Design a protein with these regions (language model features):
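Cell wall/extracellular polymer interaction/catalysis modules
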Residues: 1-110, 120-145
Length: 145
């Protein structure tokens, strides 16, 4: 088994009870990163940054039950379905307002984790995984690495 495959399998296993967002800088000048969000044995592509202060700071965050909301704005929708989940940093930072959400409209975010879905089904699946976990557990740990 390759090292990359072993590492990916371990991240998937570790993401059963938390979200792990792993990114790589793709454009340091524009502070743009691309990555994979791992959660509950699933993987979803995302981007972070390109605008404002750029990609999300690495670290630990928390999301809370009751904060996952439907959104109608184009920048929070893909395939006609929009939502967002605010993230609270668990470390000292001057950044605020970071969220998980579909990356609708013009590609890029102000630092949020902007998810890129292949279909409406994938978008709804991610939303439902987050909703169901938060309904059961009240708090979701999120790590950006």
């Amino acid at each position: 088994m390759s090292l990359f495959k072993e590492e990916t399998e371990q991240i998937i296993k570790d993401s059963e009870d938390r979200v792990i967002c792993r990114y790589t800088l793709t454009d340091n000048l524009n502070k743009y990163a691309e990555g994979i969000l791992y959660f509950s044995n699933e993987m979803f592509k995302f981007i972070s940054g390109k605008y404002g202060n750029g990609y999300a700071p690495k670290g630990k965050y928390k999301a809370y039950s009751g904060q996952l909301k439907h959104r109608q704005e184009n920048s929070y929708q893909q395939f006609g379905f929009g939502w967002c989940l605010p993230l609270g940093a668990q470390f000292e930072t001057d950044r605020s307002g970071l969220m998980l959400h579909p990356d609708g409209g013009v590609e890029g975010t102000l630092g949020c984790i902007g998810l890129h879905f292949e279909s409406l089904d994938e978008n709804v699946k991610c939303y439902n995984l987050l909703r169901d976990y938060l309904d059961k557990s009240n708090i979701l740990n999120v790590e950006i690495v």
